[in-house]
Amino acid sequence: MSEIPTRFEHAEEADKIAQAWTDAKCSHADPESSKPPFSVVIPPPNVTGALHLGHGLNNTLQDIVVRRKRMQGFETLWMPGTDHAGIATQAVVERRLKEQEDKTRHDLGREALVDRIWQWKDQYEERIIGQLKRMGTSCDWERLRFTLDPICAAAVRATFFDLFGKRRIYRGKRLVNWDTFLQTAVSDDEVFNETKKGHFYHFRYPVIDPKPGEPEFVTIATTRPETMLGDTAVAVHPDPAAALDAVEAGLREKLSDANEKEAVDLNKQIEALQKRREERLPELIQLRDMAADGRKLMLPLVDREIDLVADEWAKPEMGSGCVKITPAHDPNDYEVGIRQDLPMINILNSDGTLNGEGGQFAGLTIPKARKAVVAALEELGLMGDIEDREIELPHSDRSKTPIEPYLADQWFVAMDELAQSAMDAVSDERVQIFPARYRKGYLDWLSEKRDWPVSRQLWWGHRIPIWSVGGLSQQEANELSSELEKLAERHPDQIAQRIDSDGVDAAGEPTKAVFVCIRSEDETVEADVEALGLQQDPDVLDTWFSSALWPHSTLGWPAQTPELAKFYPTATLITSRDILTLWVARMVLMGLNNVGEVPFSEVFIHPKILDGLGETMSKSKGNGVDPIDVIDKFGPDALRFGLARLATETQDVRMPVQYECPSCEKLIDQTKKNRALPSMDCPACGKPFSTQWAETEADKSLPKAAVVSERFETARNFVNKLWNASRFVMMNLDGFEPTSLDVASLPIEDRWLLSRLSTVTQTVGDAIERYQFGEAARVLYDFAWDEFCSFYVEIAKPRLSDDSQRQIAQNVIAHGLDQLLRLLHPIMPFVTESVWNHLGQIAPKRGVPEPAEVGPFVMTASFPVADESHHDSKIERQFSEFQQIVAAIRQIRASQNIAPKETVPAAIRCSASSQELLQPMTAYFEALAGAEVQSLGPDTTAFETDAHLALPDVDVDVHVDLEKFIDVEAELARLEKLQGQLTGQITGKQNKLSNESFVSRAPADIVQKERESLAGLQTQLEAVAQDILKLQSKK
């Protein structure tokens, strides 16, 4: 037997253990296995940067599930991989390129930039995989996937080809969210609003040839005056009188239910509306009539005639009652433009500068164009008031720059049927979402059935597999189509084509475009298509398109692989709520479309980890904790157990974040101010250290502080407790002989341990099945620490030293440790594997009632199954009371500062039934509480010099004789404090029970419990008062 170290040195042991698992292929899945399958796909981390604790939580929870299923006999596949994260990764690399070399992607060119991004990907993928491995994730590392690798790429091409053939993919000109920094469209889900200080500009457009009595100008207002260069109309409401009436009716309806303060405000609004009706309504009616006559306005600065139109988008109750219409740069105006058949004039280049449609302002950036347009309007005398105003500005989540609505040609996925299929899957519970409250967000998002814009104007990603040529006459398009049909015969199932409208030529004749989709990445097919004059689309696909295929693409689809047959659909998905719609919903609809089955049957949405200030952790904020920093300080098992213990079903987790001074190891709380500093001085030792924000050579030369959280201290202590108790057990197994045991004849403490193991096994298994990881961790912690280590091991010590009892005691305690290691292994894999290895050298054959050979790894051992025949509720109740009494005696000893070597006389008043339960336990009070029980039962009375604790939950009073130990003044102080606490509690209960409303409305059983609780408190108070009198008589 190898020597058992006094400490578990995770830094030395974890890598050895992980390598042993790898060498034994413990986590490698066999698709030919006869075992039932259980598969999980990892939410692939983005290669934008390293992982933080949010990823740590996500992967720990997945690993708990996977390890337990592996131990339960399933053929488990946990598919690892990373995501290319198109827009996010390109944004990071482009920003770095600009900061370090003052270059743009256009300076480098497509191929060179993509090479740079591949280098970034390789660097961070290696780091991410390293982090995951050090956390102990038991993925099948031989099957590592990447969303841009050839296997995933084949699935992307096959999916796009299928949707194109079904006409579920189409090209259209739509208003998109345009990121001018990255020069690409971003989805609505990648946009956030930020409040900025801005202005509301009022200016006038001249009416062309106004008739007598007609207004000469129409006044409009906007926060974006530069967009007026793309205006194609001004709208007025078609029935302004009715619209104002409707607004007033709404206000009066609110008034009927308003309080006094609200009523004042509403009456002011009604008065203002009535005044507006008098002052503005006649002109609005006049403008409405002018619109009906087809009258025109002159757009200043570009001298373009624009329409005056009647449309309900105009709000007569606001501003002038008229609204400028810029269909190419505002989503609402775009809808007006569709309804009114207006021209759509895009005034922006892709980089956010004004294009030729901006006339004299072409080439200016948006801020400069805004100032120039306002100045030009002022010079023409057309500028009105300029109001200060706070404005909600949309920003790109990727580049953090303002979004511009932008009219562009994009590829879309038609979502109607696909979205409905994903909704049905959740509605009929083929996919269940836990907690169930997240179902609504999933269904609401899909119910909008918004078509999905999937093209991105980027260079990093899956290039859209479409080749096209436009500007063709119908005859030219038909001739080209015929050539493509011949080509398709030469390349079966590889080419799909479509002829679409493409606008008009210089003569005003309609033109056509031919689009070809190629299924596979085949240079020969692509060359043949390009030889016909078609060119590939330069755009790439939205990252989420490839991510949506992850559960089946990673298994080799569209090829019918053994892995796909065995492991699809996967069993469960564990992820964050942030991507429930962006990713989870799309995986469901793509799985149904491609494979015909849902990709998983259950989805668990885990809480988010927040810092101590309640903010989401992220590297960009400086509050993101690297799991490796926690592992280096506390160990991987402490990281995992700490995270599992925090994983609740209902709320996000706050975790205070600290810097660890590299000089004195003092933890310094992060604040919003210091978390952004490049360096700082430690408030404890005064020595400087750098942070992740260090940029100057001076800062970088300082030792760097790790970012950690003290919340893992308790978990590290638990690891140490488990190791120490395990070491004690194994050191007392000399001469171990596996023995068949008759459970019924075992000593009571052994039967208690077996019963508790059965109960805990059932509770932990149920909790993990319900994704209640925090509950599983809590139960295991309490059992391991309080019951196995602190109670059972202590009780067993005398028997382990007694030759006549040692063999049975060794067999039972070895079995108890064995079962505890199996239960804890999914959460704490490294320390349990290390103990298992040592235990296997001492007791390779063990178990109760029948010993059996065990394998070399706890990772592949069977997970415990609750043995109902071992369950004994009477014994568990015995020990529960016993534990509470021991705790009470220990509390009294501590309060009196009684030395550990001293034995105290104790008396225990309890019911006759409790006396029967506790009588066999009296011998153990000496070992566990340093107490000699002199009296036990209903007639037990207090000692003359008595310390007393009541245990109302079990109707027990614990008395300790303090004649030899008492500090009268200290004990009086303690009792008087307790007397005050009890008096306060009694007053509260009496007030509650004297409240007629509570007594009459609360359920009868609740009222009765309150009365019983009051009676118990009053009994305790009487006993404390008697104890006080006794002690006072000794003064």
UniProtKB/Swiss-Prot annotation:
It is found in: Cytoplasm. PROSITE patterns: AA_TRNA_LIGASE_I (PS00178). Gene3D superfamilies: HUPs (3.40.50.620), Isoleucyl-tRNA Synthetase, Domain 1 (1.10.730.10), Valyl-tRNA synthetase, C-terminal domain (1.10.287.380), Valyl/Leucyl/Isoleucyl-tRNA synthetase, editing domain (3.90.740.10). A motif ('HIGH' region) lies at residues 45-55. GO terms for molecular function: aminoacyl-tRNA deacylase activity; ATP binding; valine-tRNA ligase activity. It catalyses: tRNA(Val) + L-valine + ATP = L-valyl-tRNA(Val) + AMP + diphosphate. One of its GO terms (cellular component) is cytosol. It holds the Pfam family tRNA-synt_1. It is an enzyme of class 6 (ligase). It comes from the Bacteria. Its main location: cytoplasm. Disulfide bonds: none annotated. Monomer. PANTHER family: VALINE--TRNA LIGASE, CHLOROPLASTIC_MITOCHONDRIAL 2 (PTHR11946:SF93), VALYL-TRNA SYNTHETASES (PTHR11946). Catalyzes the attachment of valine to tRNA(Val). As ValRS can inadvertently accommodate and process structurally similar amino acids such as threonine, to avoid such errors, it has a 'posttransfer' editing activity that hydrolyzes mischarged Thr-tRNA(Val) in a tRNA-dependent manner. ValRS has two distinct active sites: one for aminoacylation and one for editing. The misactivated threonine is translocated from the active site to the editing site. The C-terminal coiled-coil domain is crucial for aminoacylation activity. Belongs to the class-I aminoacyl-tRNA synthetase family. ValS type 1 subfamily. This is Valine--tRNA ligase. It comes from Rhodopirellula baltica (strain DSM 10527 / NCIMB 13988 / SH1).
